């Protein structure tokens, strides 16, 4: 959750393979490329005022590679041999082998409060408002319905270069819909302002109604040159019935969109 949990470094979206110090003010990559040391800013703090220290970084890393977290993290950081706290504000990550991107990938680790998570299971749902390292804290929520975030007035990094022009909303609310049909009807009723549709059937059949007729909702295709997936029917032509091209064409004619 980027609203609540900060990272050691901040990636630059318009500079490939670049990152800037955020919680960490610098890192030093060893000459042999087999370790990297991060140095944490003295003024980096959690939402409760506790300073962020190397033990929090170590705890966050160990938690995310544990069996309680999603396996993707263990795969993502598989080349990390160990993490060692050097002192209160510095931590070293050692590698099994050279990896030209690993020192940047480590910078993406979200930092949790070790004190807050103490005694809690990461694999279970925790219905408490956590201590955050990011710009927002939880103001209110209802399980399965919504969560509302409030900007932390004491956010430590508001004037950091890595946060220039960002996080300008005082309140951000996420509403949860049990399926896309419900979500689309909520959109058509005006509960939110924009929807990105990627389902051809819904696009052809369901985007209609009074607000469309009144031009209060604009249905528009925005063409782009980005890579995108495909939607369609893939016929198994090893089966006799699908080997005839006319049969495949006939099946497509059965759909009115």
Residue locations for each model-derived region?
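Sec-exported extracytoplasmic/periplasmic mature domains
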Residues: 9-13, 45, 62-69, 100, ...
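Extracellular/periplasmic solute-recognition and catalytic clefts
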Residues: 64, 82-84, 139-150, 175-239, ...
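Alpha-helical secondary-structure segments
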Residues: 53-60, 88-94, 134-135, 166-171, ...
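N-terminal lobe/hinge region of extracytoplasmic solute-binding protein
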Residues: 1-31, 62, 131
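Gly/Pro-rich hinge or "lid" segments in bacterial periplasmic/extracellular proteins
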Residues: 12-15, 106-166, 170-171, 178-182
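Aromatic- and charge-enriched surface segment that lines or borders ligand/interaction sites
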Residues: 26-70, 86, 92, 177, ...
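Surface-exposed binding/hinge segments that line
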Residues: 39, 74-117, 135-142
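A structural "hinge/loop" feature
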Residues: 1, 20-23, 50, 72-73, ...
